[in-house]
A protein has these predicted regions:
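Cysteine-centered catalytic environments shared across enzyme families
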Residues: 1-308
Length: 308
């Protein structure tokens, strides 16, 4: 988990803008205590900030924001197939200075732009500034959060809502639809958040911000949609041994790609089937030992996961 924050304004940055950016990064320090950095261009009106939690390639070379040619990135998440991407485009990429996924994502975007999503398998939220456009995006299912707010002079974004609420003095709104969603689901569906002029980037979506005639121009596009056949009602039949084998292979592949790390890994182990199955496959199929953590609440037996 890292934290990103930034803004792209239709005017030149002034010193107070930079101070606001630094202050917001401090509010996100808990998301990335290993390193903090920012990059800005006063003339272009762009500020990108990043708080880092080091997982892959913990060296300083992997610090962010990271720049390559005319492309700068501030990124939170993990690209599980970054090694495959690195091999696939080895003839297109210049020599790598790091062993992490950030540089792979950065160079992939520099090469393919919005077509980069076709290559990605992972959880991510990132901001990319290229030439005179800012791109904000999150992963296919919105696992990594990214909030944004549009003002008269530009667009602001953050991994968490609080820096934007505090900086822009955003107010709660009393909306029936939002209230119902929160009561039923425990959250409000994106892009809404319950605050005025505060939005959450939707899954499989990218936002492009550009400056035209001294005004900020915003567009939003879906980069992926699930196959319509997923929602069709299929014929019910018993599970076959082939089905079970296929699911097992998919699970093992999915788990193994998520265990690439240069720091110790841990597993939240509940009394449920899913985490127990993951722990079992890690040990028996991948032959890896992993520390497991189970949560117990003394006064809340409903959420007591200690009985495994």
């Amino acid at each position: 988990m890292c934290g990103i924050f930034g803004f792209y304004l239709s005017r030149k940055l002034i010193d107070s803008d930079i101070k606001y950016g630094e202050k917001a990064l401090k509010e996100l320090n808990h998301r990335g205590p290993d390193d903090s950095g920012f990059w800005f261009d006063k003339e272009k009106g762009i500020f990108l900030g990043h708080n880092r939690l080091s997982i892959i390639d913990t060296s300083k070379k992997n610090s962010q924001p990271m720049k390559y040619n005319d492309t700068i990135i501030s990124y939170n998440g993990e690209i599980y197939n970054y090694l495959d991407i690195k091999r696939k485009f080895k003839n297109d990429f210049a020599n790598f200075e790091t062993n992490g996924d950030t540089e792979v994502l950065l160079k992939l975007w520099n090469l393919k732009g919005i077509n980069s999503f076709d290559e990605l398998d992972g959880m991510f939220a990132f901001a990319v500034f290229q030439k005179h456009s800012l791109f904000l995006s999150v992963d296919f299912f919105g696992e990594k959060p990214l909030f944004y707010s549009i003002s008269k002079d530009g667009i602001y974004f953050s991994s968490e809502a609080n820096p934007l609420i505090n900086l822009l003095n955003l107010k709660l709104i009393n909306d029936l639809k939002n209230n119902l969603e929160f009561s039923v689901f425990g959250y409000i569906n994106s892009p809404n958040t319950g605050y005025e002029n505060l939005y959450k980037v939707e899954p499989s979506t990218y936002i492009k911000a550009s400056i035209k005639n001294s005004k900020i121009c915003i567009s939003k596009e879906k980069y992926w949609k699930p196959n319509e056949r997923i929602f069709e009602k299929g014929k019910i039949r018993p599970f076959s041994s082939k089905d079970i084998k296929s699911i097992k292979e998919i699970l093992i592949d999915s788990i193994s790609t998520r265990m690439i790390s240069d720091v110790p890994l841990g597993l939240f182990l509940s009394s449920g089937i899913d985490s127990s199955l993951i722990a079992c496959l890690i040990k028996k199929e991948l032959n890896r030992n992993i520390e497991a953590f189970t949560v117990k609440f003394d006064k809340n037996l409903v959420h007591d996961e200690s009985e495994i």
